[in-house]
Amino acid sequence: RSTLFPYTTLFRSTNRDVYDQAFELAVNAEVRRGIVEDGVRPDGRKLDEVRPLSSQVGILPRVHGSSLFTRGVTQALNIITLAPLSYAQEVDTMETTGGKRYYIHHYNAPSYTVGEPGRIGSPGRREIGHGYLAERALIPVLPTIEEFPYTIRSVTEIMSQNGSTSMAATCSSCMALMDAGVPIKNPVSGVAMGLMIDLPKNQEITAQDIDKAYVLTDLMDAEDFAGDMDFKVTGTKNGVTALQMDMKVHGLPVEIMEKAIKQSHAGRMFILEHLTTVIKSPRKELSKYAPKIEKLMINPEKIGAVIGKGGEMINRITAETGAEVDIEDSGLVTIASSDATKIKKALDWIKSLVEEPEVGKIYEGTVISIKDFGAFINIMPGIDGMLHISQITDKRLNKVTEVLHEGDEIRVRIIAIDDKGRISLSMRNLD
């Protein structure tokens, strides 16, 4: 405001906002002049220089994974929570239904992070957009649910900010995922690129103007407000995973975009090297506080046997074992619990429901009906076999009821399965 003091007589009857706008324009003009004429940024950095970096992992011992990423004044705390697949977010759009998100990134940046008071309410467009960009940045390197049967929630809490918070969210979530033991394919880093063009406003930019285009690595707030572009790039050592760009000009030639992408690669690699010095690869074991999950692939045709009529069977398994059971349409079954004994009990139960009958194997069965020629035995849920009277004992029998009665529990061996799937059983020579 002291800069504008000589001119205050011109604004005595003007709203205070005019002063604020004039001051902002003066600052923006000075930021642009420093970069274009002197090649110096507001904090003294070179055009391709990244702010000082500092990071930690495992700073919150009770959560499943955590990290703190600091770049200059911008600081992001990330927390990872692992849960069974049933916790996936159901997604319905105008075009599709039934989609699920197994990786969810939530981004929060309260007013206090920029030194202002304010209410904390539902997320706005900025929070949703930044969270979605950081989410998209990590999706290409995440394991499949078959490889890692967990729903993953990543929450970034911005602690302080001066530009590039979405890229800080990307870096902090990458480190927290590795701290949690999520087997990501490669670490991911992100950097925001800026642009100052030394041309009159509204003048068309051509390829010949590339020498007048000043590309900035690791954009800060003052440069974002004064500049012509905010271009966010995330990726691994092998390639780019996400891009997002805002422009204040009417278009950019390919040559300037190429320059920005090449310069962003150097910035990303510098940040990536820093991340991998803090945590090089995903931890081999999950947190002791994370739920234990076992997976089993079954024939999709057997899903009905596990679920049962009206969900009766799966509800019974959950109630009697205390484990949580989820089934995907692909046949992937996941069993989750904090107790390994409960998981094993549920797993064995499900295996017995979906097991295919095997010739030569001995089963515990129940006599379900008696006929003159033999008996029908239930050996597995939904699977019966026929025990001929000649296969009950080595001695000759006149009636099946001399040995067997409905409801008897007996041991039988499968001796044959014909091409129609009919099973022949025997009680002879079981030892």
Where in the sequence are the language-model features?
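Conserved phosphate/anionic-ligand binding catalytic regions in large, soluble enzymes, centered on
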Residues: 57-80, 162-183, 304-314
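Flexible hinge/switch segments at interdomain interfaces of large molecular machines
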Residues: 104-114, 145-149, 234-240, 250, ...
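Single-stranded RNA-binding regions, centering on S1/OB-family and related RNA-binding modules
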Residues: 289-293, 300-431
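Structured alpha-helical segments in the cores of large, soluble enzyme domains
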Residues: 101-107, 111, 130-145, 177, ...
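Short, small-residue-biased leader/transition segments that mark boundaries at the very start
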Residues: 3-10
